[in-house]
């Protein structure tokens, strides 16, 4: 018996969001309620956390369950499936008795159905509540380019704000890279800075996280001195949903 059904005519939003989350966490719960679908999970090393929120408004059709449901997902398997989505594909998520999640991809009458057995999830973390000194919103291209540029010279990147400038900074034996954007630039949609900040983060995680930018409308970045980095990718036709990552700072000796 189908317990819930969620349909969206553009599978690309889910393709990029699940692909990015699946690179960061190995297992994740899928919590389904009358308000939509939520997932929260930590990576095995507890360096990063992924929070996916898909309210019912994000879907073209949403049939909620009568009671809250929870499925456990092997994110590697989910990633393999959503990568198969074509540009023109629609996507449907369904669940049966908290035992199976069904993912349907297709268009124009051609449909592929994938079934995933629910796995046991031991712990569902709470989303942290943090007070950040810096909050900016950028176009997705900026953070993609900044992370890829930093990766040319180092495995660590410093993210910071000083005056009216928000920047990434990476240094290594091969050189130095400083992608930056100033208040008022088209790439910087919002800019709120209480104090100057600069904190280092591991690039290997960031390279995985920015995969979500391909399907995002915008990216909110929040940070503080020696605090976790928060990245929020707005997803969906009008940015109704969001994928948020938290990344612990890199302790420098």
UniProtKB/Swiss-Prot annotation:
PROSITE patterns: PCNA_1. One of its GO terms (biological process) is leading strand elongation. GO terms for molecular function: DNA binding; DNA polymerase processivity factor activity. Keywords: DNA replication, DNA-binding. The keyword DNA-binding applies. It comes from the Archaea. It holds the Pfam family PCNA_N. CDD domains: PCNA. Sliding clamp subunit that acts as a moving platform for DNA processing. Responsible for tethering the catalytic subunit of DNA polymerase and other proteins to DNA during high-speed replication. Belongs to the PCNA family. PANTHER family: PROLIFERATING CELL NUCLEAR ANTIGEN. NCBIfam families: pcna (TIGR00590). Homotrimer. The subunits circularize to form a toroid; DNA passes through its center. Replication factor C (RFC) is required to load the toroid on the DNA. This is DNA polymerase sliding clamp. It comes from Methanopyrus kandleri (strain AV19 / DSM 6324 / JCM 9639 / NBRC 100938).
């Amino acid at each position: 018996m189908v317990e819930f059904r969620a349909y969206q005519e553009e599978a690309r939003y889910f393709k990029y969001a699940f692909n990015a989350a699946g690179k960061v966490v190995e297992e994740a719960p899928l919590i389904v309620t009358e308000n939509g679908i939520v997932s929260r999970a930590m990576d095995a090393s507890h360096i990063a956390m992924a929070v996916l929120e898909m309210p019912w408004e994000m879907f073209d059709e949403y049939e909620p369950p009568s009671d809250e449901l929870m499925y456990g997902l092997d994110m590697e398997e989910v990633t393999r499936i959503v990568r198969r989505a074509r540009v023109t594909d629609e996507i449907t998520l369904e669940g049966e008795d908290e035992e199976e999640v069904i993912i349907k991809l297709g268009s124009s009458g051609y449909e592929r159905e994938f079934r995933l057995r629910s796995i046991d999830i031991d712990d569902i973390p709470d989303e942290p509540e943090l007070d950040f000194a810096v909050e900016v919103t950028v176009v997705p291209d900026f953070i993609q380019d900044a992370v890829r540029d930093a990766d040319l010279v180092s495995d660590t990147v410093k993210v910071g704000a000083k005056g009216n400038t928000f920047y990434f900074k990476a240094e290594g034996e091969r050189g130095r890279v400083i992608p930056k954007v100033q208040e008022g630039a088209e790439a910087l949609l919002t800019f709120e800075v209480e104090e100057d900040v600069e904190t280092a983060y591991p690039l290997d995680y960031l390279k995985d996280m920015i995969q979500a930018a391909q399907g995002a409308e915008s990216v909110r970045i929040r940070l503080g001195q020696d605090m976790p980095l928060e990245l929020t990718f707005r997803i969906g036709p009008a940015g109704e949903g969001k994928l948020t990552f938290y990344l612990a700072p890199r302790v420098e000796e």
